[in-house]
Structure formats: C-alpha cells, structure tokens
Amino acid sequence: MAHIEQGNRVLMLSYSNVSVDGAIMRVHKMKPNMKPGTLVRYGYARHKDLLEHRYLTSYNLSIHNHPELLKERQDLIAERKKLPRTSPRYVQIGRRLTQIRNELSSEEKETVKNAKFVATTVSKTVVDSAVRDCEFDVVIFDEASMAYIPQIVFAASLAKKHFVCMGDFRQLPPIVQSNGISPLNADIFQYCGITSAVDSGRNHKWLCMLDTQYRMHPRIADFASRTMYGGLLHSTEEMEKNRRGIVDQKPITGHAMAFADLSGMMSVCTKTGDNSRVNVLSALMSFSLALEAAKNHEVGIITPYHAQSRLLHAMARDVADANPELKLIACATVHQFQGSEKDVIVYDAVDCYRMPYPGMLLTSTGNSYANRLFNVALTRAKGKFIGVANIAYMDNKNLSSSLMFERMIEGQRRKPSCLTGQELSQKRTAISGSTMSFFDNDEGNRRFLKDIAEARREIRIDIPDKPVEDVFSRQLAIALQTAKGKGIKVYLRAENKQGIPSVLRPLAIENPFVANPVVLIDKKVVWFGMPSSDAKFKSEGSILQMRYRPVIRFEGAHTAASLYGFMEMSKTVDQSKIVSTDEEGKAITDTFASYVLANKKCPSCGKPMKMQKSKKGKFFLACTGYPACHETALINVDLVERYFYRHGDTGQHCTRCNCSLEAKLGQYGLYIQCCGSQRHRYKLDEI
C-alpha cells in the first residue's frame, strides 16, 4: 500500500492462485473504496468472493466497463441454443461470439496496463505478454520458497526500482523430481545463504524477519516455533482470546492441538492406480471430525496424498448437496492449501498397514522436506489442529525423532486431547445424520439388511477375511439371493473365497486385493464395516488384533463413485485358483468362472484353467499355472452352453424375465442373451 500511495506501479507475483487471491483481497480490504481498475487480479481466480466481485478481476472489470457486450453475448448464446448447427445464423453467431471474446480479452490487457496494482501467478506472467511487456516500479514475489531460481531472476527483471521476495524457507520447497544436486533443488533463501545464516544463529543483510504471527492460537504457534523456527516465532497478546471461541467448541473441546488415534482399527492403506495412497477408514474418521466442526466454523482437511484428497472432496460434495446450511469443508493436499487458512484443520496422515513403510511425504528428512510439508499443514489452522493417524503403525516403523509429525505424536500420546479408537467409535454417533451415520453391530445389521432389500440396480460387497457372525451371514445370503431373484446385480468379492462362510461362497468371487470391508448399493449408499469381519493386520510375521470395528453408513453418489474407482470394484472376474466347496464338500459351480475352474484343464500342463479379462474387456481362458505355463484359449459357445445345462435340461434363466439364456457368436465375439422378447444381455462375469 505504501508503494501505491507513493505513485508506484506494483506487480504482485506468487506461485499459486490461492496465494494471489488472498493477497489482492487483503489489499482491497485495506482500501475498499479505491477507484475500479486500480487493483486488478489477472488470470484464473479461485476465491468465491473475488469471482463475484464486480471489478477486482480483469474479466469482471472488462464486463463492468462494457456491460453491453455481456448482454449481447448472453442474448446470442440463448438464440444459438434454439438453432440447428447447419443454420447460417448459427455460424454467424459463432463468429460474433469470437469477436466479443477477443474484444473482452483486449480490454483485459488494457486493464493490466492501467492498473496501479496487478496480482497474478508467475506462470501467467511468463506466458502472457500483457504483464511481461508492462513496466512496474515494484515487484513483490510472495511464497518465494516454492519458486525456482530462474523464475525469481525473471521476476526481478520486471522491476524498475524495487524487488521484494517474501516467503518462509521452513515451508514448501520447489517441486523437483530429480534427486540430483542442482540449483533447481534450492529455494532463493538457500541460494542466497539466508537459510544457513539463520540455522547458525547469524543475521543476514538481505533478511527482514517477520517474527510475529496473527493467525494461529498460541499453542499451535508455539509448537511450530519450537520445532521449526528455533523459538523465534511469537504471537500477539490477544491471539489466545481471539481464538478461544474455536478452541472451546467441538470436536475435542478445550484443546487447540489434538489427535485421533486409529490404533486397533482396520484403517487399511492401499496404493491407487496412479501410485498415490488412500485409506478409507482414515478418510471417514477425519471427515466425521470435520463435519462436527463445520456446524460453527470454516474447516479444512489436509492430506499428503492426492487420491485421499479426492475421496475426501467427494464426501464434502455429497454433504454440501444434502446439507447446504453447513459451511463447505475444503479438502486438498498440502500444496493446494498453501496460502489459505481455516478455523479448524484436520490433518489426515493416511499411511498405515498394508504399506510396508510411510511414504516420503511423511518421512523424508532430506532438505527437511516432510517437516516443511507438515509445517504448512499445521500453520493453516487459526484455532484448532487435529492430527489423524494410526500411532501403533507409526511406532512400529520407528520414525525419526527429528520429524515434526513424530514430535506431535509424542506430545499428544495418552493425553485427554488424544482420542482412542474406543472414543472415536462411540463419540461419532453424536454426528449421525442424513448423510453420515455410525451404528453399533445389531443396529447396523438391521439397517444394512434394510438397504439390501431396498436396492434397485446393484449391490457390491467386499469382504477381507472371514465375517464374524455366521447367523448374520445366513441372513445376508438370503437377502442377496432374494435381490438376485429380482434381477439386481450382486457382486460379492472375497479376499479368500474358501475362508468365508459356506452360505456365501456360491455368491462370491475371489479377488486377493480386497482390503476394505466396503459395500456400495446402487452406487449411492456406502457401508464400511459390513458385514462385520474378523480381518486383522499381518505385519512382519506377526498378527495384530483389531479391537474396534466401527460400522459406518455414508450416503452420496460422489463418494460411492470415488470408492468404486479407487478399489477397482469393476474387477469382477473370479481369481480363484482352487475350486470352492460347500458344507458337504461338493464343488461350487454357481458362476461361470467357478465352473471353468472346476471343469476345464490346461492342455499343456493339466492344471485348471480360469477365466480372465483383458484390459480391453475381452474374456479368455488362462492357465492357473502361470507364470510357469502361458497357455491361453478363447471361450467358445459349447463351454458356456454346458455351464447353462450343468444341472439338467431346464438350463439357466434370465434373472429379469425368467426366459432361457443362450450363448451366441456375433460379429464382435461371444455374447449371452435371453430368449425373451426384450433380449436381455449379460457378460460372462454376470452369469
């Protein structure tokens, strides 16, 4: 502001859109009555208030200056919707819309030339001559620790009088994939020797240290100060009073820093197809804590892994759709949260068994990488920070005592601010509502069977290990058979088909990668913990008992779609290598895949053949002796017909119209259809 008042033109650059949005909103708040066009946000804004402001963004300012173009554009779009694409008028409107877009774009560039304060990202500046060709007296580079040295040099070249780097060298470093030593690995503070000077207790002539913070509750700030800033960070006297309203409300009332310990719970961490990580129970518990806080405060959930943030974001969308009165819960990775703040932050660490070791985002000590990431997450919280992790897993992996995350665990362990698995399972019932509900076993069994009975299209069940209750297993088997009789698709995947109750085996297919007790009904209703199983963690030769098994129901199409993708629930081909048997020891051949396994032998080695599905969705036969035997074969009509008539002359019938099923060979290969008038079709993993 001082530079603007002195008549200087100022360019504010940052690495992230969130940071740029925050900077211009703060400047506008200081001088809200400035003439339109004095302050301009150029580029893609993300902040809701900024997007809705009449003239702070360059695009909105262009429309503010030329409202007639906006009206003409809206009228033309409405007219074009009613025209066929081949109409000459349709083409004419398209040309005029392009002209309007170009006129507005030119106007945006003019607003940049005339503004006193321009805020944008460094990447936008590099590619857009509208900023690059302007003259600025002062250039301020915010979040400079994230930038590469060449970007800093480029930004400095745009300043006529002053260049200021602002940032925290204890927070996010530049993102570099290579492990080699290079100037690109260092931030500007390391490159200039500022970091080494501070580490050794010396001053640096270029450094102006801002050592008073105005965001966090003092307990949060003190922990950050002790672990990352050598005790140099201080809080203003009124900060504790200002944040008391957040601390004294749920969740974990009375504590600015708290922890939710998932030890003794089946919080399974698995890798996704893009090599990220996801933990379903950890996400559910983190979200339940955030949901409790969202009744009164702005809440964010931060996680190291992109896949987990996508799952949490899907849950937030479902809750927002069902409960518009609640404040939207922001869910993102650490990098996406840089530059923003929330009243309450929930940090979901994700890592747990079955991962052999926590990922580098939690454990890397090189360049203090993990500490810098966690420091960003911690310092986003204004009043309350809640960590969520399986402490027993972290203890088992012997994390370095230099890690900020490990020091938080040690500081919270066995304190009233650290919720145990028992407290998490019981206390979550307080937030049960229309979208997310917690149940005890008996109540959960009843509601689960009710949802099965009300299913309309499909039921997908994953069972890791053996269900605990045989009585409930029989009730579930009856409910699933009834659903199949109504034409509902039922997919029951077991980690080990032979290990589940015999009443469920005829319905089951084997998939050794099933890891979570998750159910999806009609791709909308999600259950975790049903049917209740005896699943345990197996780690380094020992078996870890699970003491707490929460039963959770979540309703939301976005969440169901995310889980369907992350858990690869479309993979419904039986992976069994041995034939399952019933209580009397007879082979179960109630699916085509199990029939193939029991009756088809490899012509090369004599081992059973099994049905497989290619990446293109084509079914074929492969030897169970792979990789020793590479024998494969096509599936022919005769084999499918023999399966249909395995129990006698009546054959197999369509579950939707009760007409006979038949196998045929068409232009695109083998297909199954019924003989009824509607010709219902089935895939080989559906019969």
Model-derived regions: residue spans:
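Walker A/P-loop
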Residues: 1
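Gly/Ala-rich phosphate-binding loop of Rossmann-like dinucleotide-binding domains
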Residues: 4, 28, 294, 484
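Conserved P-loop NTPase motor core of helicases/translocases
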Residues: 9-135, 175-187, 243, 317-320, ...
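PLD/PLD-like phosphodiesterase catalytic module centered on the HKD motif
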Residues: 424-617, 621-687
